[in-house]
Amino acid sequence: MEIAGNSSTISPTFSTPTKKRNLVFPNSPITPLHQQALLGRNGRSSKRCSPKSSFIRNSPKIDVVNTDWSIPLCGSPRNKSRPASRSDRFIPSRPNTANAFVNSISSDVPFDYSESVAEACGFDLNTRVLAFKLDAPEAKKPVDLRTQHNRPQRPVVTPAKRRFNTTPERVLDAPGIIDDYYLNLLDWSNLNVVAVALERNVYVWNADSGSVSALAETDESTYVASVKWSHDGSFLSVGLGNGLVDIYDVESQTKLRTMAGHQARVGCLSWNRHVLSSGSRSGAIHHHDVRIANHQIGTLQGHSSEVCGLAWRSDGLQLASGGNDNVVQIWDARSSIPKFTKTNHNAAVKAVAWCPWQSNLLATGGGTMDKQIHFWNAATGARVNTVDAGSQVTSLIWSPHSKEIMSTHGFPDNNLSIWSYSSSGLTKQVDIPAHDTRVLYSALSPDGRILSTAASDENLKFWRVYDGDHVKRPIPITKTPSSSITIR
């Protein structure tokens, strides 16, 4: 590059002046390239050679050359005074007026805020995006996109937790009810009528209409010790304290006949079609055929003390009895000798119940000194389950709707319990404080929803133990079996 008015040549990289001269530029327009070079020189430090000379020595720098030769590939050089427009891969060009707004958005985010966002999202800022990682675990089931697409968009429904009613649905007065563990003074018929004995009187309460009527009254010398409905609910048998057994027609409210044979009170009764079995304090069990005049057709001698629990199996093939001698006897219908004798209880056995959904399964419960509930296989005689109830067992009732059993208790808890039964054991579902005194008597409604309990606190309470999904449609009741019975 040559300077005007001089033939000497200046190296583009470095030069040293030899003579004192003034640099004079002709009056010609300054090109943008030359202007940038001058601006670069003005920004550098200057040094005077001597006081006698007015020449200012400027040492050319290599960055001046760099600045001079920073020429764009095409077009005119960019004017530094005009701000460059910003662009990115999504917006090729932006108006210059929006630069301030864009700069504020694209400015660096504070590190604390980025760290907080990363922590909330669950990833580490120091982790590389493309770093080597282990593969994600495979799904247990292959994902079928068609199945996922066709699946109905329904919320996941969890089964509702079962709720138990811990308060009675209805409470009736039962004044004068006898406080005796060995008696059975409450029963519920298949026609939805409740019978309860209060000292010398028998009352019936219609659960449909709510009406109450007095059915029977005994002599002053005796009292009512037990009541039991026939299968169709047409007849009510009443055991007395003097050893007699009366049979009443509920519809006409008349006594049909009185059957003798026992020498002591009759504390328990059980029907098997036209045969009525009665257990007495003497330990004897009598079978009565109510169709004939000579009603006593059999006697069972298997207990040395009072018989307080008696129950026929639903098919009528076996009879179970429990006594104050702590013994459970299982009898075949055609034999007077017990098939199985169980002595596992340590107290009187009043609670005896056959399972409705497994005909050969028998449950028995012991008194205050025992507090055990045993389950027996009546076909083999084996004990299949045992549970400690924690208090005196006064009655056992199987649920017709599910594999559950209800138990009522005396000392010390006086409660109503519901158990879930399985072959591996029992699980208590709920304990309901039922009465202020021991719960002596209980009966289940024909639809299996409501359990009635009675105690010496002179209250008759009704508990809704099953409802909703736990209840199936009740089996219709027909009068065919008992309607053909002619009681003489």
Curated annotation (Swiss-Prot):
The keyword Cell division applies. GO terms for biological process: anaphase-promoting complex-dependent catabolic process; cell division; metaphase/anaphase transition of meiosis I; metaphase/anaphase transition of meiosis II; mitotic spindle assembly checkpoint signaling; positive regulation of anaphase-promoting complex-dependent catabolic process; positive regulation of mitotic metaphase/anaphase transition. GO terms for molecular function: anaphase-promoting complex binding; ubiquitin ligase activator activity. WD repeats lie at residues 178-215, 219-258, 261-298, 302-341, 344-386, 388-429, 434-473. It comes from the Eukaryota. InterPro entries: Cdc20/Fizzy, WD40/YVTN_repeat-like_dom_sf, WD40_CDC20-Fz, WD40_repeat_CS, WD40_repeat_dom_sf, WD40_rpt. One of its GO terms (cellular component) is anaphase-promoting complex. Belongs to the WD repeat CDC20/Fizzy family. This is WD repeat-containing protein slp1. It comes from Schizosaccharomyces pombe (strain 972 / ATCC 24843) (Fission yeast).
